[in-house]
Amino acid sequence: MVQPHVLLVTFPAQGHINPSLQFAKRLIEMGIEVTFTTSVFAHRRMAKIAASTAPKGLNLAAFSDGFDDGFKSNVDDSKRYMSEIRSRGSQTLRDVILKSSDEGRPVTSLVYTLLLPWAAEVARELHIPSALLWIQPATVLDIYYYYFNGYEDEMKCSSSNDPNWSIQLPRLPLLKSQDLPSFLVSSSSKDDKYSFALPTFKEQLDTLDGEENPKVLVNTFDALELEPLKAIEKYNLIGIGPLIPSSFLGGKDSLESSFGGDLFQKSNDDYMEWLNTKPKSSIVYISFGSLLNLSRNQKEEIAKGLIEIQRPFLWVIRDQEEEKEEEKLSCMMELEKQGKIVPWCSQLEVLTHPSLGCFVSHCGWNSTLESLSSGVPVVAFPHWTDQGTNAKLIEDVWKTGVRMRVNEDGVVESDEIKRCIEIVMDGGEKGEEMRKNAQKWKELARAAVKEGGSSEVNLKAFVLQVSKSC
């Protein structure tokens, strides 16, 4: 019998790579050989760290996306990138698979992340079974499915900015316009940069429709999204999350927890020592992920709000966000007396620190799962893609946070920032309920990945299928 060998094909963005690597580690722990492949540029950066920390059983390979020296979002065209990654990626991915076969290690199953439907086409051509690794919530996949299957006209009405507009989709909560993925709201299409997104999601669903038994592995867990996981009858949605290092889920991470956290940045900052000096549940942590750049005006409003609440904070402002000298925050001296600003931090280490009181977040799915798994309530500031849906779930379904309201210019003002942070932090009834709910979801997340937990059982069943197909 051939040794089971999974090829994991990952879109080259930090938010895709992190959960994919955790997935790879889980497969390896269950005795599956894994080859992790992403773009040449991302592979080069990973390889430096992987040389010393990659777990045994994980192989790294690269495919070309046509931008082997890196994609520069402020210069390069996103639509051209998606065209290049398809054409170059398809050919070079075939080469990776054929080379592996020539070496006596044939790929027996292919798993790919979203935005890469062409990877499934390559697998089909080479008669290799494939599965999609969906790294957003099941709720978001359901919304896209409904959009392309009977609800498109109704959802297009959401762009009218009518505050009373809402839609009830099967097995999902009542959704307003602000709760839909941004690519479905036509007002967001004025930015032509991401016009490739919706057709790519449609192609992804068409690809699944063309399979006899489409499998979608979802970075969620049954207790968190029980109804959304059952919403699409013709797809087999399988909750296998949260895909974060097990050492942060109350378990032992036998495969080097340092590998697969934050591959593209490291910091020698003393922020952890600083957190150690702070009282329990006192820190406001502010971070907006690896892609989002805030306007100077928005940063000023956040700074003003932080100064007004007079609470210690840890704020991540990435190096590429740094302004010219004349554009730096006007109240920097006051800020530095009250809190700490860093270019990067290990988010899971921060979220699990006893001093953490709340997380002001863009609500990317990785950050959302990390906050739930750490039991930290959220002040939600969503911007685009799935973040509005995630904020809806945080505020109204899981009840672990509050969503900030933007003004007519799309800016959250300092008074609103102050109001929302105080709801979570001031010890009142609402904040207390959020804390209790956050603790509840923390325990449920840990239970899901323990032996006999829903995600562990689901992943074992998938591994059994992979092994049988050899």
Curated annotation (Swiss-Prot):
Disulfide linkages recorded for this protein, renumbered to the chain, are none
This entry's Enzyme Commission designation comes to: 2.4.1.121, 2.4.1.263
Q: What does its record list under induction?
A: Induced by abscisic acid (ABA).
The cellular location(s) given in this protein's UniProt record come to:
Cytoplasm; Nucleus
**In which tissues has expression of this protein been reported?**
Expressed in flowers and fruits, especially in pulp, and, at lower levels, in seeds.
Variation of activity with pH: Optimum pH is 3.67-8.
A Gene Ontology biological process in which this protein takes part is: negative regulation of response to water deprivation
Q: What happens when the gene is disrupted?
A: Increased sensitivity to exogenous abscisic acid (ABA) and increased resistance to drought stress due to smaller stomatal apertures. Acceleration of fruit ripening with abnormally long shape by enhancing ABA levels and promoting the early release of ethylene (IAA) in immature fruit, and associated with altered expression of fruit ripening genes (e.g. ethylene biosynthesis and cell wall catabolism). Up-regulation of the expression of CYP707A2, which encodes an ABA 8'-hydroxylase, thus preventing excessive ABA accumulation. Seeds exhibit delayed germination and root growth.
The residues that the entry says bind UDP-alpha-D-glucose are Q347, H362, W365, N366, S367, E370, D386, Q387
Q: What is this protein called?
A: UDP-glycosyltransferase 75C1
Q: Which organism is it from?
A: Solanum lycopersicum (Tomato)
